């Protein structure tokens, strides 16, 4: 494409520095572009993109307050304000690893590092537009949802030995998978790999294995790819899909943690990590991931009220693990919930959830009057709701328990179990309120983990037993039987192996949680009292032995 042909193309430049906008516009004009607009912020860019179509968009990564370039690109695509053939070039003076990884992860058409010379700009523009011209019919077919036509065009380009054969192969493999042409995809990826060991082809082949239902094989393949190339983020995404298909939430969390470590500013993965941590009962990790989701997702299309509600929800769950540790996190949650409707448009259900969560946290933090007032507000809002919402009802029960109204909470739970008896999805949410799960999935999970914990306990492998009981009671924090199994394994380890500060502290904190739920009328109360007495004896003996050991060492020195 000659420079005279650039005159009809529209260009948008986004940068918060006027001098850079002017310099880049001047360079583009010199190259032959005549329709050039420039703005200083992401919000201005979105506004102008809603009104006009641009063939090329240049955006700085750091745009000051508001959206950054990565978030802008993601939102433009999310809102479908650009076509596949349009070019988005991300520019940055920040070459830190986190920024570069996040930038490449959102797949701009190119990435330029400041300062940019006129020669570099010209070379990149010519290369990008030449590729655009050759692949334009393919892009148009995809935009028109005519994927079979796009496949035919790509096959023709490959048969003609297109200079963009690698791009054609990558796109063709994706389209084969989307159109369920798995054998063709497999042949393509194997052909590519027979001549070059390319990461995208390896992941593509693993995606074929996923499509065939070979989840374990695919997961093993992807593990190898990640070990060899830990920065290739698409491998983590495919491995996450494999874990979901295998129903292995624990492994899924580990995969997402590695992905978040590789690219901390990848907002979507941080959110997915936070969600699965909450499902797994790993509330400390959930809180960290939700905070990062909120931090990095501010001003992006990932920024929504549910992230804040889930952060508050995770904070309330700390009380089911460690009462002492929970108090330090509550102030953030209260501030967040008090201001949530000032920033977002919240639905009626979200407003009720926020109020109930706020009531819980204030009750657990000792602010009984504030908690009661908030609870009454929520009750009024619930009475006006047109439809039932199981998530609202779960928080209603949690608020009752936090306020010491255990009898009322039990009545509400009993009614919920009757109403939702044929709704497994709802029952899975209710499981977290119960001493024992009632959903099919919950019973299966808890049965498997609990059995393993008991088997290890019987064989006196207390460390493994503790690991399994700890995992199970995090998933189902109100299951008192599990907590008692957990502390029994901890006590047995202390008695057999001696002083262990971590185990003693875990036992004490778990007993504090049990005390919130087990009254003298509870059938678990006698076992609780017996184990509590055993613990005090074991802890005193272990601490005495530890002091004696330390004193002997001092005398020896």
Feature map (PLM): residue ranges:
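C-terminal output helix
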Residues: 116-125
């Amino acid at each position: 494409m000659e420079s005279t042909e650039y005159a009809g193309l529209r260009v948008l430049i986004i940068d918060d520095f006027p001098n850079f906008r002017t310099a880049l516009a001047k360079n583009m004009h010199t190259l032959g572009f005549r329709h050039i607009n420039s703005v200083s912020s992401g919000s201005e860019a979105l506004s102008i993109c809603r009104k006009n179509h641009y063939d090329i968009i240049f955006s700085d990564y750091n745009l000051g307050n508001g959206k950054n370039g990565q978030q802008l690109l993601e939102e433009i695509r999310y809102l479908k304000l650009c076509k596949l053939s349009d070019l988005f070039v991300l520019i940055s003076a920040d070459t830190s690893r986190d920024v570069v990884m996040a930038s490449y992860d959102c797949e701009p058409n190119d990435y330029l590092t400041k300062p940019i010379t006129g020669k570099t700009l010209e070379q990149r523009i010519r290369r990008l537009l030449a590729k655009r011209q050759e692949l334009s019919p393919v892009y148009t077919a995809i935009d028109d949802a005519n994927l079979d036509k796009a496949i035919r065009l790509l096959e023709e380009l490959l048969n003609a030995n297109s200079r963009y054969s690698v791009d054609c192969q990558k796109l063709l493999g994706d389209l084969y998978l989307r159109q369920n042409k798995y054998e063709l995809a497999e042949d393509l990826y194997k052909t590519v790999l027979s001549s070059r060991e390319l990461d995208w082809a390896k992941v593509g082949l693993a995606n074929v294995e996923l499509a065939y239902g070979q989840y374990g094989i695919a997961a093993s393949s992807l593990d190898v790819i990640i070990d060899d190339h830990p920065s290739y983020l698409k491998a983590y995404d495919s491995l996450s899909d494999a874990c979901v298909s295998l129903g292995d939430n624990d492994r899924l969390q580990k995969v997402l943690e590695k992905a978040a470590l590789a690219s901390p500013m990848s907002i979507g993965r941080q959110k997915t990590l936070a969600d699965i941590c909450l499902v797994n009962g790993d509330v400390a990790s959930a809180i960290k991931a939700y905070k990062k989701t909120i931090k990095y997702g501010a001003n992006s299309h990932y920024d929504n009220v549910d992230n804040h509600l889930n952060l508050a929800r995770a904070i309330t769950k700390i009380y089911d693990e460690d009462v002492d540790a929970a108090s330090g996190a509550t102030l953030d949650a209260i501030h967040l919930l008090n201001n949530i409707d000032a920033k977002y448009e919240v639905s009626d259900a979200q407003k009720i959830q926020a109020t109930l969560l706020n009531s819980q946290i204030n009750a657990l933090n000792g602010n009984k009057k504030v908690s009661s007032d908030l609870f009454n507000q929520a009750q009024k809002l619930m009475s006006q709701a047109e439809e039932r919402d199981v998530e609202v009802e779960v928080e209603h029960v949690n608020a009752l328990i936090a306020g010491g109204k255990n009898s009322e909470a039990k009545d509400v739970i009993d009614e919920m179990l009757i109403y939702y008896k044929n709704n497994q999805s709802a029952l899975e949410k209710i499981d977290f309120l119960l001493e024992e799960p009632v959903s099919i999935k919950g019973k299966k999970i808890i049965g498997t983990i609990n059995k393993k914990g008991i088997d290890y306990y019987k064989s006196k492998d207390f460390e493994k037993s503790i690991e399994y009981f700890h995992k199970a009671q995090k998933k189902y924090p109100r299951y008192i039987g599990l907590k008692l199994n957990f502390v029994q394994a901890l006590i047995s380890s202390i008695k057999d192996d001696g002083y262990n500060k971590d185990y003693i502290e875990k036992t004490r904190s778990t007993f504090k949680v049990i005390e919130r739920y087990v009254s003298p009328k509870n059938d678990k109360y006698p076992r609780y009292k017996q184990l509590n007495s055993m613990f005090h004896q074991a802890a005193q003996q272990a601490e005495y032995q530890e002091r004696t050991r330390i004193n002997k060492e001092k005398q020896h020195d």
